[in-house]
Amino acid sequence: MTIQCSVCRNHVQSMYCAHCINTSPNLLHPLRMQLLMVQQKNKVLKGKVEDILSHALDKNWKSSDNDTEGIILADRLHKLEVLKRTKRNNRVRYRISQLTKRIENKQQRLQSLRLQITTTDVAKVSNANKKEIEEIRTKYLQLNEVVKREQELECQSLVDWFILRKRNSYEIPYTLVFLPVVSLKNFHKLPKAVTISSLHKMFQFLEIYSQIISFPLLYKGDEIKEKTINTDEEIAKLITKLVINVLQIGRFKNLIPKDAIDLVWLLDQYDVDSLFYNVIVNHKMECRVVLFHWTFGKVSKVVTETLQLPAGSTTSFPRQQVGDTYDKDDDMWHIVG
């Protein structure tokens, strides 16, 4: 049975029924043979293609046929790989160029902002802001002047309260609450109790004075409050602390150079009492400048050597008599008029 086109009447395909196929094997046998031959050709072609691909991909190729197809395919695949790499490199290069441009733009922006920061001054500020700044500056200067005047008045009140005086006397040129201000030259001439009392008042004065000028002291003189001063060496350490406090206040008030000073020359010219008085009354002092870093131990050594105290001394030097005073360490009535 054949299929016929109803338009052109052309026989396109034959069709057999199941009965004919089962009863006539010769009809199906040629078709089966053709199918087997096609399958065999497909296997051969498949093996050939695999060999060509194996050769093209640099695998072990052992085909006995002509390898022209493999060489051509390998060349094409190599070109394809080169094109892929080129495309990928171009994409990366383009991305790098874009990032480079962004970085350059950001650098230019950064430079422009820095230039604006460095070139911005009061002239670029608006008139309202300039007026506000001037008002704040004026108020600050006024408050600063008020604070300075109040500090000066309080300092003068403190001087009057402690009765800090300068006397026309060589041995005792300065007094504080009617007690002689301790110096290196009158140290051995005053009773020990008077020396300790004088140092106690001087530390009290400096503590209140530092609070007025808002300057913290390095040393407070707590040894006097605890009454643990027994030897001249301990008194010398107390004088060292006093000298350091006075020097720090003098530097804070710009009365003494802030560079490394010649402390030996300064104490020789002014001594402790004159140094104390000049700093309190705001007298500027000239001083030699040296390349030397002063520490507590070095200042203590200068004070000890000036007082001519032996190192590690545990005893007190005998006191000399000054005026009508008595040579007693427990004399608390060494009052100067």
From Swiss-Prot:
Its main location: membrane. It is found in: Preautophagosomal structure membrane; Vacuole membrane. The keyword Membrane applies. GO terms for biological process: cellular response to potassium ion starvation; cytoplasm to vacuole targeting by the Cvt pathway; pexophagy; piecemeal microautophagy of the nucleus. GO terms for cellular component: fungal-type vacuole membrane; phagophore assembly site membrane; phosphatidylinositol 3-kinase complex, class III, type I; vacuole-isolation membrane contact site. Residues 87-153 form a coiled coil. The keyword Coiled coil applies. InterPro entries: Autophagy-related_protein_14, UV_resistance/autophagy_Atg14. Keywords: Autophagy, Coiled coil, Membrane, Protein transport, Transport, Vacuole. It is a peripheral membrane protein. Residues 5-20 are annotated as: Cysteine repeats. Coiled-Coils at the N-terminal half are essential for autophagy. Belongs to the ATG14 family. Required for cytoplasm to vacuole transport (Cvt) and autophagy as a part of the autophagy-specific VPS34 PI3-kinase complex I. This complex is essential to recruit the ATG8-phosphatidylinositol conjugate and the ATG12-ATG5 conjugate to the pre-autophagosomal structure. ATG14 mediates the specific binding of the VPS34 PI3-kinase complex I to the preautophagosomal structure (PAS). This is Autophagy-related protein 14. It comes from Vanderwaltozyma polyspora (strain ATCC 22028 / DSM 70294 / BCRC 21397 / CBS 2163 / NBRC 10782 / NRRL Y-8283 / UCD 57-17) (Kluyveromyces polysporus). The gene is ATG14.
